[in-house]
A protein has these predicted regions:
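Non-catalytic, polymerase-adjacent accessory regions of viral genome-replication enzymes
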Residues: 1-84
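Duplex nucleic acid-engaging cores and interfaces of nucleic-acid transaction enzymes
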Residues: 2, 21, 96, 122, ...
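Generic alpha-helical secondary structure
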Residues: 22, 52, 83, 87, ...
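Reverse-transcriptase-like RNA-dependent polymerase core
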Residues: 56-59, 91-117, 126, 130-138, ...
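Short conserved micro-motifs on helix faces and helix-strand junctions that flank
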Residues: 61-68, 73, 125, 180, ...
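Amphipathic alpha-helical blocks
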Residues: 65, 77-103
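Short beta-strand-to-loop capping motifs
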Residues: 79, 125, 311-315
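Conserved polymerase palm-domain catalytic core
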Residues: 105, 149-150, 155, 162-322
Length: 322
């Protein structure tokens, strides 16, 4: 997708949030999460009129919304309905059944890759995509407040260009020339569902009804190209709107563990101070880093984009120990 289109989508999303009055809600969720508050009652926000209408607008701006799932419907079919009907149907799908939310089977499609292989893509039904978008909009600011600054994939106001810029900074300015490269093979297909739910809980997302909905999203049946149906016991569905956010939740512990070895080490944090560079205020930890280099601690920095990450070290010894 061209950069111009990507920027346009981001700006459209912001304008939509302002239009439906959700921007202040998102800011409040971020601030509360940053201060360590818990969130036991999020479903009311997720199923609010403004959040549902915002989700519709955000999905409609994506051309993929016109691709049908197993129910053969797309965003155009929802667009023909009055807003009140859409809102009521979303609420009914999520809470109206005695068995709880049950997403329809996800359509599996194999997408060709440049190397001749294929990548599996899941296409949820459009109503389930709308519900995932409603959930994502509320979860994202809560999770963003807890995510590491060194993660760049599938996050608002961050991109692969930011990851590349950080990489060049570590190589050329910090002179960290020993680099370990990692790519977690089959990561999205092997996410442990139970562990993911525990990680969401530890981030403060403690609405049990919401966690039940997320479990159902993860375990949605998959309709294979040959017509058979599979029932996943692990993994996040590639193609699901909420999947990239959940993947970042899973890898957030890795980010913070590596940060704790150097960037967020107590010695660095205790000697940090604020200073102005040009017009921006930054936190300078250089004094702490100087003291830490006199110890046996490993100097290491991570740059992660989804399941692909690099660890940068000062010397070969630290790289081998890492």
């Amino acid at each position: 997708m061209p950069k111009e289109r990507k920027k346009s989508l981001c700006m459209d999303t912001l304008r939509h949030a302002e239009y439906y009055g959700m921007l202040q809600t998102f800011d409040d969720l971020y601030a509360k999460s940053k201060s360590g508050e818990k969130f036991p009652n999020l479903m009311e926000l997720i199923l609010s009129q403004d959040n549902i209408m915002l989700a519709y607008r955000n999905i409609k701006s994506n051309t993929g919304s016109y691709t049908a799932g197993t129910d053969h419907q797309n965003i155009g079919d929802i667009g023909k309905l009055p807003p009140s009907v859409v809102i009521e149907k979303v609420r009914k799908i999520v809470t109206g059944s005695q068995h709880g939310y049950r997403p329809k089977p996800v359509r599996r499609k194999d997408i060709p890759k440049p190397n001749g292989k294929t990548r599996p893509l899941g296409i949820p039904c459009i109503w389930d995509r709308l519900i995932q978008q409603c959930v994502k909009q509320i979860l994202e600011p809560i999770c963003e407040a807890k995510f590491s600054n060194n993660s760049y994939g599938f996050r608002p106001n961050r991109s692969v260009e930011h990851a590349i810029s950080r990489t060049y900074s570590l190589l050329q300015r910090a002179h960290l020339h020993y680099v370990l490269e990692f790519d977690i093979k089959g990561f999205f297909d092997n996410v442990n569902h139970s562990k993911l739910i525990r990680q969401l809980w530890s981030l403060g997302i403690q609405d049990k009804q919401l966690l039940f909905v997320i479990k159902r999203i993860l375990k949605a049946p998959i309709r294979m190209p040959d017509g058979t149906t599979e029932y996943p016991t692990k993994g996040t569905p590639q193609g699901g709107i909420i999947s990239p956010l959940l993947a970042n939740v899973v890898l957030n512990e890795l980010d913070h563990w590596i940060d704790s070895q150097w960037v967020e080490h107590p010695l660095a944090v205790s000697h940090a101070y604020r200073r102005i560079i040009r017009t921006s205020e930054v936190i300078d930890k250089s004094k702490g880093y100087v003291m830490m280099r006199r110890t046996g601690l490993k100097e290491m920095f991570i740059v992660r984009y989804a399941d692909d990450f690099r660890i940068f070290c000062r010397n070969r010894e630290d790289a081998e120990r890492t």
